[in-house]
Amino acid sequence: MKVLMFGWEYPPHVFGGLATANFGISQGLHAQGDVDITLCLPHPFGDEDRSACKIVAMNSVPIAWRDVNHDYVQQRVGNIMNPDDYFRYRDHIYADFNYMHVNDLGCMDFAGGYPSNLHDEINNYSIIAGVVARSEEFDIIHAHDWLTFPAGIHAKRVSGKPLCIHVHATDFDRSRGKVNPTVYAIEKDGMDNADCIMCVSELTRQTVIHQYHQDPRKCFAMHNAVYPLKQEWQDIPRPNHKGKEKVVTFLGRLTMQK
């Protein structure tokens, strides 16, 4: 099976939980032995672990034709993407995007992470997804969280392939009810267009069903997992707390959601 995956971050450049989750599911799918993953990231740096997936640098995918040679493309983007892919993507530009702010390669730049113009970058990412979806071969689309839902929808409309969205958190979780209407609309649009909705917990699944009015039959709880501790860590002697004051460890962010 070939998976076209849309992510927003990936180790070692971790801005939030998405990077770790994206890495984990990529490694897990790759370990099955019969899954090939093409992972689209807005701004990879070139030092990402590519053992489990092919990484597409969305900031190096052209949306406007530029007459450049192979050596120049190699010089500009060779550290993050195969120059041959640049020319393959260039052959699948589907509209005149010269009115957009593009660089000398006809590509759009991304800040990486979560900049102040995040909604603009989400929209730009979805435009580029149309080029990638027309160029790659895949059987299913996997989109991580609301940031990539528009890209996943675009890829589905282009290809007709099923869309599986991965809900790591909803805006109800992040805001505890004070929902951003723009974010909510993007989330709901992604869910409405999805063929399968993966939720990280049963609580999230119930939120998706009741707050976003989704069919329970396409919503599944897919719990996050943890890596086994290294043996050297398991061998660390446990402290003796008998007779001492009880200690509670909280491992998480100090947010309403946690």
Model features per residue range: what roles?
Residues 28, 34-133:
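A conserved catalytic-core segment of Leloir-type glycosyltransferases
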Residues 3, 140-142, 149, 153-174:
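Active-site proximal beta-strand in glycosyltransferases
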Residues 1-15, 40-45, 58-60:
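Nucleotide-activated donor-dependent transferases that construct or modify glycoconjugates
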Residues 203, 225:
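Carbohydrate-associated surface elements
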Residues 141-142, 192-202:
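A short beta-strand/loop micro-motif in the catalytic core of glycosyltransferases
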Residues 9-21, 50, 258:
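A short, glycine/small-residue-rich beta-strand->loop->alpha-helix junction that serves as a flexible
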Residues 240-258:
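Conserved donor-binding/catalytic core segment of Leloir-type glycosyltransferases
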Residues 130-135, 180-197:
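Membrane-proximal helix-turn-helix segments that form the acceptor-binding/catalytic region
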